[in-house]
Amino acid sequence: MARITGNRVDAPAGAVPAYNDYGPGFYCTPYAELAREWACPQRGKDGIANRYELDLGGLGVLDLEAEGCSVLTWLAVLVSNRPVQVSSPIARDGMEYLRRVFGIDLEPYDVVRGYRADDSYFSFVRAFLNNTLSVAQVGRAMRLGGLGSQVMVRSELAFGRLCFRGYETVPACEYYPLRMCRDASARRAFQDERAAADLDGLYIRDILREEVGPDDPRIR
């Protein structure tokens, strides 16, 4: 796995601030190329990508990308950990419903894997809560936008398994443009989905009205 940072970090010392996608933890990605992009958020400023190895044997792993795991579960985890400003009753009620019905207690898990949702991608979440994207549209926008996967190490047991395997300097001249290209791709996917009418789609208003649950086949 690779960790993106401005400095070499031989031994992660603990959690990042609580308001991250899956709560406090050590965030990495299993994809080296993606880590290199994340390491270069500024034009002209090289980054550093640290490499780690993690033995998952015996660890409790929650995979939010696994087959059978609804996008609503991913959304519920996000809105349970990241502050979301909502301005309408339906968005407020929808957020609370997601937390209550589709939320997952992360305490039993040592590691969480799933899509990332930085600020540009969080538009998907807000649009869904505001009833302008359907469940299917959110799923398509996430896949087509190339969000990328992240792995969050959250327990002491998992931290003890992390082994530092080196680091590399990442040239911004190469990876900053790639990062911006991925960001633009996600924004296009979002705009394309928002412009399309999903007349038969399942929206947050429908979920609230029908009290849709995790076993409903329409959310698979």
What are these regions (language model features)?
Residues M1-F26, L34-R36, C40-Q42:
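Glycine-rich loop/turn
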